[in-house]
Curated annotation (Swiss-Prot):
The active site is at 206 (proton donor). This is Homoserine dehydrogenase. NADPH binds at residues 10, 12-13, 44, 106, 303. NADP(+) binds at residues 13, 44, 106, 188, 191, 303. InterPro entries: ACT_dom (IPR002912), Asp/hSer_DH_NAD-bd (IPR005106), HDH (IPR016204), HDH_cat (IPR001342), HDH_CS (IPR019811), NAD(P)-bd_dom_sf (IPR036291). PANTHER family: HOMOSERINE DEHYDROGENASE (PTHR43331:SF1).
Amino acid sequence: MTVNIAILGFGTVGTGLPTLISENKEKLSKILDEEIVISKVLMRDEKAIEKARAQGYQYDFVLTLEEILADSEISIVVELMGRIEPAKTYITKVIKAGKNVVTANKDLLAVHGTELRALAEKHHVALYYEAAVAGGIPILRTLANSFSSDKITHLLGILNGTSNFMMTKMSEEAWTYDQSLAKAQELGYAESDPTNDVDGIDASYKLAILSEFAFGMTLSPDQISKSGLRTIQKTDVEIAQQFGYVLKLTGEINEVESGIFAEVSPTFLPKSHPLASVNGVMNAVFIESDGIGDSMFYGAGAGQKPTATSVLADIVRIVKREKDGTIGKSFNEYARPTSLANPHDIVNKYYFSVETPDSTGQLLRLVELFTSEDVSFEQVLQQKGDGHRAVVVIISHQINRVQLLAIQDKLKEEVDFKLLNYFKVLGD
């Protein structure tokens, strides 16, 4: 008996999947009592087919999706093309043809996931996407299964390997933003246009998917607050270390009584926090829940083999569900109405770096500005000025989002003060 699959896209992960199937052939056969066979591979043009054959791949390469749709033996289609189009159009056609889908396309799922999941349910087929979040970490299935009896209250993750690589270089080797980005591009971690990585967009897509599994609520990327790495200076990293923190780009979801709040932002993590030691291109997700307490899931966030492993796990799960007659069930069965938290209910400590005139009385003026919004200080550091301008660094006590925005507005109105940076600070 065989399970016939088709692959759309034959890039890094697409070429890694056949190798993984071959390496695990005996184990897969024992688990499924069937052999997984790659029946067709969709390629973009004849030149790509020639290149693949020259590399030793001898699959049935095709140039149109229709050739896959017309093959009644193919039950699972694996989309590994990336980007929203033509992936969305292709997946829609595959689902309507009654075939199951596995994808690693986080962009597509974050933007059009609700629509595609509804379509899959209507046509009684599977739509699985474990590899879309944190590559080789089986976090989605863990949330869907192992946390089904628990209430998650807080999720915090390092979800983008490129930005984490850059922050590691900035923290451990005192590199600048530009130096760390150039190295990430040289190593192939960052694209020539790094916007999605450095501005928190990629992480926000993953956070949108995680919100469904962890909290049962669907968030669009537009409902997730985003800030990235571009404004981070060496002095910010140095001050974080001086105060006992590590600066990381994190994705966070908090649930409070009024709803959930999701944010991607540079964050001061206490050096004792489990995520503070997650370095390089690695990813991790830290979860606080009522039953289990604190738990963390760590692993490769990308790469050929880790991502292909998650893709293959989805294929195995689909075959099992076909055998037990539950193939139409959603990947994530936890859903409730989305409720966004009241900004007054979202509280954190914050780091502020403010440039002021280097003259008597300016620190007092700055203190008065903050206290006018009922914001008090946990730590204050006035850096040595040049006789003209100085920098004051503040870590506040807990404040809510409304107070944070008010402080930003007041600093913008003050011609003598310039807000250089502000970052969330975690820890008691």
